[in-house]
A protein has these predicted regions:
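Active-site SXXK
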Residues: 59-81, 94, 274
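Short glycine/serine- and small hydrophobic-enriched flexible loop segments
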Residues: 70-78, 108, 185-192, 300
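Structured C-terminal helix/loop/strand segments within mature extracytoplasmic catalytic/sensor domains
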Residues: 2-20, 175, 179, 184-311
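Short, well-structured active-site flanking segments
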Residues: 74-93, 103, 197-201
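Glycine/charged-rich beta-loop-alpha catalytic/anionic-binding loops adjacent to active sites
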Residues: 45-56, 87, 165-168
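Active-site-adjacent helix/loop patches that line small-molecule binding or acyl-intermediate pockets
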Residues: 3-24, 30-31, 86-182, 189
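A short, well-structured edge-of-sheet supersecondary motif
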Residues: 12-53, 264-265, 271-274
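Structural recognition of the beta-strand scaffold that forms the well-ordered cores
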Residues: 35-38, 61, 93, 105, ...
Length: 311
């Protein structure tokens, strides 16, 4: 496990959870339908922080796109796929405004597959093996937090058909799954640790996740800032994020989720990381302001020099 939960962080995390529940439970933030990881670089140079239900296997929505960004750029760097105009645009758009079409284009290029019509027998087996490369890339990194996760399914605006439905299973048993800790591990390795990217490829991966309140599209909900955690941070805060959000998709297993992974630089120059994954119609649809309000609380508490419980 990459994250150490110290005694201080256990106290701070418990106090933070209590305050979040006091402020947001009535607005849909239920302790049994959420996962939270908060962490920073400790004095030892390793990740220290707090996890609440960090191993919760949850439908991740568009959080998988940050993983595909790393995978795709790594293949370009190693010469396994060639950068071209549409790939360059897709890598940008799947993060900038969370385009599912762009993401699925990247998935096709990375795996050498296409979706849609039904397959059977050996043809389906070979197709499935190729798509499993999406999981294999991260499994091969040896991250314990990725065990049991799945990011091999395409991103759909509603229900699946053809080989995509075959692959996900009739009951959705093989839909995408991530945990808060698996997302936290990706963020840690991307900014503080070691991912299979270097030089301009690493800088691009980090840069794509940057969110700027003065960006021309910042007020557009697709930019995933104003209605997510980053929307509660003061203008001018240096931050990086990728959110996930599903309303009704036609399947209960993938409906009404809202997530965010966020890194910001505190006033003293130290970065802090937050992963929040949630399930529920109130958070996902009814009250879009909950996430920015949570972000405002997190910013206030996690920027403090003193532990939260000292308040």
């Amino acid at each position: 496990m990459f994250l150490t939960q110290t005694q201080e962080w256990t106290r701070r995390g418990a106090a933070l959870m209590a305050e979040m529940q006091a402020h947001f439970d009535h607005r849909g933030l239920r302790a049994d339908a959420m996962g939270l990881v908060v962490f920073e670089r400790g004095a030892s140079g390793q990740a220290e922080g707090f996890a609440w239900r960090g191993d919760w296997p949850c439908y991740p929505c568009s959080l998988v796109k940050a993983f595909h960004l790393v995978h795709g750029l790594s293949m370009v760097e190693r010469g396994q796929i060639a950068m071209h105009a549409d790939l360059d645009r897709a890598l940008r758009d799947m993060i900038l405004w969370s385009s599912n079409t762009a993401t699925n284009y990247v998935i096709d290029l990375v795996t050498g597959t296409t979706g849609d019509t039904l397959l059977s027998g050996q043809a389906f087996d070979e197709w499935r093996t190729a798509r499993e490369r999406l999981n294999g890339f991260f499994t091969d990194l040896g991250w314990a937090e990725f065990a049991g996760c799945n990011l091999s399914q395409k991103l759909m605006d509603d229900t699946r058909y053809g080989r995509e439905a075959q692959y996900a299973g009739a009951d959705g048993a093989y839909l995408n799954v991530l945990t808060p800790l698996s997302v936290a591990r990706l963020m840690w390795e991307l900014f503080e640790g070691d991912v299979p990217l270097s030089g301009p490829y690493l800088e691009r991966a980090r840069g794509e996740l940057s969110r700027v309140s003065t960006h021309p599209e910042a007020k557009n909900s697709a930019y995933q800032l104003t209605e997510f955690l980053g929307g509660g941070l003061p203008d001018g805060t240096e931050l990086w994020s990728k959110a996930g959000h599903n309303l009704w998709t036609g399947a209960l297993e993938s409906s009404y989720f809202k997530h965010d992974m966020l890194r910001w630089v505190r006033p003293d120059g130290r970065p802090i990381y937050v992963v929040l994954m949630t399930k529920g119609q109130a958070l996902a649809e009814t009250d879009p302001q909950v996430f920015p309000d949570i972000g405002q609380l997190l910013y206030a508490r996690l920027n403090m020099a003193e532990p939260v419980e000292a308040l």
